């Protein structure tokens, strides 16, 4: 945990409410996000119980599974879910704009610019907490390999037509959520905790009600008291006043309300199956419908408070101005969405259960690169985040006290001005360390020369590792972004009196070495493939799949 985060947490405890951890919003929030509040059944991994879903706060769609162990009812739930999510996704897939992308020419092997389609916008899925993202991944894995009756007429339990397609999309959303800075699938608790620091632990921040209680406590109540009430307060029936954000449910809800309701539904269904005439069947059908409606009411009772809190959290996030680099990261999400749309339209098979060596290495490299890029961009966008980097010795800010023109040695000398900066920060500067500042949106690099004292610079070395080694005057040599001429271009060199901020981390991340194609991968890493790969089959049917 960084020093500034610890200080903010202590300040939140002292003040009794959450403290800002950012001055701008570092994640994209769509105008019309799809909010998904799922519930699962205790005792069986991934068995859906119900959900509230929709893009309109006042008109959510309620989905429920009266008997979660019944495979047919599960498929009916997934089909309803597909009827909501897929039209929402399709509404973004058809509106495109022209864009340029660099691709390798197969004939020449050179990188060339090609014009391609890019979706003008992309869908955004919001779940209450990190566990919701895990559930989306689990749903995607369980659905994308299912076979429909059209694909396999002899399948014993064919899936509804659009269920496998929904599984592919949910898998894509879940994989994209692993990329730092992506906003296609967001856990609201994580986003709120990124922008506000509470007086509780990061694990407790996963409780959406407690987190919002710290950020916006009721009048006259401290954040700690409001959070404790959100976590523990129960009504006269012993039910939590603020149900968990899901997808797991509260044991008291399961034991006292849900289990009796499901037993009532099972009895009504058994009675309907045993009806001997039409009149008796009509009466028992009414009892079955009433039992089902009761379960739907329980699901809504458990999800509605979370639904309202998710929209409250989105309203809080919208009060913050968007960071300068958020649009750039959202554009990468749009490229990702467009690429998956094209793969689906091209008829490619579902994503495999396990990535091959090259794909896995590429994913890991992408995530590492995007994490470094996100850390740098958040600091450049937000003075409060930059303050944390300065406290950590990874950046420094100060006033330019002197600029001395100097030139490089060689046949064609280039300008290499020496800039002296007075700072109160204590950056971790080593010999010839690089520093960077933002100049017109591009990074300008400089080299650490040494600490200056009484106007004379001391050459930096291992022993010159802080202001105590030579005072708080830092001498830097500007290296680039000054034009091609003998004299620097106007505005490219700092002037005396300028207030600057230099970072010791790079602002832009370079791509790594290109990995071989799967056909060229050594056998030690899973290749080359001996025969053509075949589409993966669904998970085997177990006793738990059928009631």
Region spans (language model):
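Short aromatic-glycine-enriched beta-strand elements
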Residues: 50, 416-419, 472-474
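Loop/turn positions that initiate beta-strands
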Residues: 430-434
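C-terminal effector modules of nucleic-acid-centric enzymes and ribosome-associated factors
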Residues: 435-440, 445-448, 453-454, 458, ...
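Long, charged/polar, low-complexity intrinsically disordered N-terminal extensions
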Residues: 1-122, 135, 142-176, 180-181, ...
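Structural motif
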Residues: 38-42, 127-130, 423-424, 439-440
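Accessory interdomain/linker segments of ATP-dependent helicases and helicase-like nucleic-acid enzymes
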Residues: 7, 284-429
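Alpha-helical structural signal
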Residues: 115-128, 133-142, 146-346, 444-474
């Amino acid at each position: 945990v960084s020093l500034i985060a610890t200080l903010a947490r202590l300040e939140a405890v002292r003040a009794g409410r959450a403290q800002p951890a950012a001055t701008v919003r570092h994640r994209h929030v769509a105008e019309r996000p799809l909010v998904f509040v799922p519930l699962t059944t205790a005792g069986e991994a991934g068995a859906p119980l119900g959900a509230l879903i929709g893009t309109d706060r006042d008109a959510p769609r309620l989905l429920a599974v009266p008997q979660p162990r019944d495979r047919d009812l599960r498929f009916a739930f997934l089909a309803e879910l597909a009827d909501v999510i897929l039209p929402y996704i399709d509404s973004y897939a058809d509106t495109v704009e022209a864009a340029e992308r660099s691709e390798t020419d197969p004939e020449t092997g050179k990188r060339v610019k090609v014009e391609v389609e890019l979706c003008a916008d992309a869908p955004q899925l919001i779940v209450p907490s990190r566990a919701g993202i895990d559930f989306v991944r689990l749903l995607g894995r369980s659905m994308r390999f299912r076979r429909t009756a059209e694909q396999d007429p002899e399948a014993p339990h064919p899936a509804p037509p659009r269920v496998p397609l929904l599984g592919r999309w949910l898998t894509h959303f879940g994989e994209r959520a692993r990329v730092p800075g992506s906003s296609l699938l967001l856990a609201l608790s994580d986003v709120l905790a990124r922008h506000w620091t509470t007086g509780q632990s990061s694990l407790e921040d996963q409780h959406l009600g407690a987190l919002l209680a710290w950020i916006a406590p009721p009048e006259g109540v401290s954040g700690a008291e409001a959070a404790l009430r959100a976590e523990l307060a129960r009504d006269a029936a012993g039910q939590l006043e603020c149900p968990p954000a899901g997808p797991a449910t509260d044991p008291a809800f399961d034991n006292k309300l849900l289990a009796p309701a499901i037993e009532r539904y099972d009895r009504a269904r058994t009675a309907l199956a045993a009806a001997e005439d039409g009149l008796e069947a009509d009466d028992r059908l009414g009892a079955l419908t009433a039992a089902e409606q009761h379960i739907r009411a329980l699901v809504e009772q458990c999800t509605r408070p979370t639904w309202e809190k998710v929209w409250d959290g989105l309203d809080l996030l919208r009060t913050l101005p968007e960071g300068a680099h958020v649009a750039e990261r959202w554009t990468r999400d749009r490229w990702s969405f467009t690429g998956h749309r094209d793969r689906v339209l091209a008829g490619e098979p579902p994503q495999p259960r396990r990535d091959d060596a090259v794909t896995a290495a590429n994913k890991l490299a992408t995530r590492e690169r995007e994490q470094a890029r996100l850390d740098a961009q958040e600091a450049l966008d937000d003075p409060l985040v930059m303050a944390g980097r300065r406290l950590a010795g990874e950046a420094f800010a100060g006033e330019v006290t002197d600029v001395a023109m100097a030139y490089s040695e060689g046949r064609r000398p280039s300008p290499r001005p020496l800039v002296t900066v007075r700072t109160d920060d204590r950056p971790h500067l080593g010999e010839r360390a690089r520093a960077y500042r933002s100049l017109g949106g591009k990074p300008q690099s400089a080299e650490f020369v040494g600490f200056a004292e009484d106007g004379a610079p001391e050459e930096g070395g291992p022993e010159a590792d802080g202001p105590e080694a030579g005072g708080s005057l830092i001498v830097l040599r500007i290296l680039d972004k000054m034009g091609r001429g003998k004299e620097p271009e106007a505005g490219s060199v700092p002037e005396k009196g300028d207030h600057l901020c230099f970072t010791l981390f790079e602002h832009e991340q370079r791509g790594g070495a290109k990995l071989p194609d799967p056909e060229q991968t050594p056998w030690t890493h899973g290749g080359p493939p001996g025969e053509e790969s075949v589409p993966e089959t669904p998970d085997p049917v177990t006793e738990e799949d059928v009631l």
